[in-house]
Amino acid sequence: MYYSEKLEEEILDLPDGLLARYLRLTDLMLKFGSNLGLPHTKPLESGLFELRVKGKEGIARVFFCTKIGKKIIMLHSFIKKSQKTPKKELQIAKSRMKEVIKNDSF
């Protein structure tokens, strides 16, 4: 499940190699659960996780959280351009996660 249609479109617009890897990893998450472990998923803080997508075109990150019933909600994505995750990108994911927790429609 996606936080918004816009986010789903952004993810589907990833370069082909990154998109293929993303789809493979999300398929594994649906089959085995959201915690695939490193190098695929990494817990960040208080229920926020990152899906680590690597391909020939670069590195993408997709932040996600889970809700009761094992529902996985993709919150935010970006193409990584530096070693460290930009605080702005992390803040967007945290803000959206708070909204998801408060809103029962997800």
Specify the residue positions occupied by each region the protein language model found.
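Basic, Lys/Arg-enriched alpha-helical interface segments
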Residues: 1-59, 68-72, 81-106
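Residue-level signal for short, function-critical loop segments
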Residues: 78
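ATP-dependent carboxylate-activation loops
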Residues: 75
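Hydrophobic/aromatic beta-strand elements that line small-molecule binding cavities or substrate pockets
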Residues: 62-63
